[in-house]
Structure formats: structure tokens, C-alpha cells
Amino acid sequence: MRIILASSSPRRRQLMELLGIEFEVEKPDVEEEFLESPEETVRELSLRKAEWVFKKRKEEEILVIGSDTVVVLDGNILGKPESLEEAKGMLKKLSGKWHVVYTGVAFVSSETKDVIVSSTKVRFRELPESVIDYYVEKYRPLDKAGAYGIQDFAAVFVEKIEGDFFTVVGFPLGMVWQYLYEKGWWKVASKREDDKGGARVAFG
């Protein structure tokens, strides 16, 4: 069985690489929309992404992983900004406040259709308008829910965090690994006598 990451996000690809398993990447063609709740939104969109790729390759023996992230501020869902001005507006709203980041991860194969959802609370410092302008103009966060990436300069915006850091990045790595491990899909491969490279990881 091969594993495919249904994503266009370079951050999710980088995090998947930390698992030490071989995988492919394919961008799903799924229109993003907000549903009644943030949990339902990330659950449904991550599943749609994984199913889109799975159906395209349904003749193959694969496991597809899809993921989606939203930011919630005062009960309102913030997705990806459509313009730099909208990005600045989002960051002004987040300044000095708590918000919640929700990330869903879906796993789809011929025998599996599971979704996990993780949430993390984040509090931003008070952000001067000049800093917001600098960040948006330099980093152009149009591909990020809430208009920021906690793994880049926006890390300095964070005053407090309660929960999983990688949920905010957009891919709760520990939960993904635990799921794969418990399913028997992530395992340490048997070391061959002629293998001088140390322990190896196998998938499937």
C-alpha cells in the first residue's frame, strides 16, 4: 500500500516527511466552504480532499490523507484571506485576543474512512499596525487560515498557547503518527545484517 498526501501545503508535506515514510503528494480540487461548526467544517473538508484523490486513483491500493484547518474568533470562522487587505483585517481582529485553531485529518482507503479533529487555543499579543503591515507584505499569508503561520515570523505574535502546536501549523503530527501506528501502518522495519544505516521505518 502506498500513502498519498492530498494537499498543496508545503508545511504539511514537511511535517509528513518527519514520519520517515515514503509518500506522494497530490493537490485535491475541492472548493472550501464553511459549515455550521468549525469541527464539522474541518471534518468534512479534510474528508472531501482525501476522497477526491482516492476516487481519482480508486484502482490503486492506497491510503490517502487529507487535512483542513480553520481559525475561530468570537464564534466566527476565519479561513484563508482572499487579499492582502483581508489578511491585515484578520490580524487586526486577532490582535490581543484568544482564538481557537481547528485541524481535521482524514484517512481514506478501500477499507478505511476515519477523521480525527484537534483544537488548540492561541492568544496573540497586541500587534502594532506597522507590524501587521510588515508581516502581510513580506510573508503574503494568503494560503493560511487566519492569515498567519505560527512556524514563521508570526510565532512572535503568540503570547500563550494551550494545546498541540502542530494543530496550529495545520497538521497534528503526533495524532497522525499515533493513528498510523495503531493501525499497523507505521512500524520500524527489521534491520538487515548488511544495513549500516541503523533503524528504518516501513509503511503498510
Swiss-Prot record:
One Pfam assignment: Maf
GO cellular component, one term: cytoplasm
Family: Belongs to the Maf family. YhdE subfamily.
Gene Ontology biological process terms, A to Z: nucleotide metabolic process
Xref: SUPFAM superfamilies: ITPase-like (SSF52972)
Location of the protein in the cell: Cytoplasm
Reaction(s) catalysed (UniProt annotation): dTTP + H2O = dTMP + diphosphate + H(+); UTP + H2O = UMP + diphosphate + H(+)
GO MF annotation list: dTTP diphosphatase activity; nucleoside triphosphate diphosphatase activity; UTP diphosphatase activity
Active site: D68
Cofactor requirements of the protein: a divalent metal cation
Superkingdom of source: Bacteria
Function summary: Nucleoside triphosphate pyrophosphatase that hydrolyzes dTTP and UTP. May have a dual role in cell division arrest and in preventing the incorporation of modified nucleotides into cellular nucleic acids.
Annotated site residue numbers, Important for substrate specificity: R11, T69, Q151
InterPro entries noted in UniProt: ITPase-like_fam, Maf-like
S-S bonds: none
Keyword field: Cytoplasm, Hydrolase, Nucleotide metabolism
PANTHER family reported in the protein's UniProt record: BIFUNCTIONAL DTTP/UTP PYROPHOSPHATASE/METHYLTRANSFERASE PROTEIN-RELATED, BIFUNCTIONAL DTTP_UTP PYROPHOSPHATASE_METHYLTRANSFERASE PROTEIN-RELATED
EC number: 3.6.1.9
NCBIfam families: maf, PRK14363.1
Name this protein carries in UniProt: dTTP/UTP pyrophosphatase
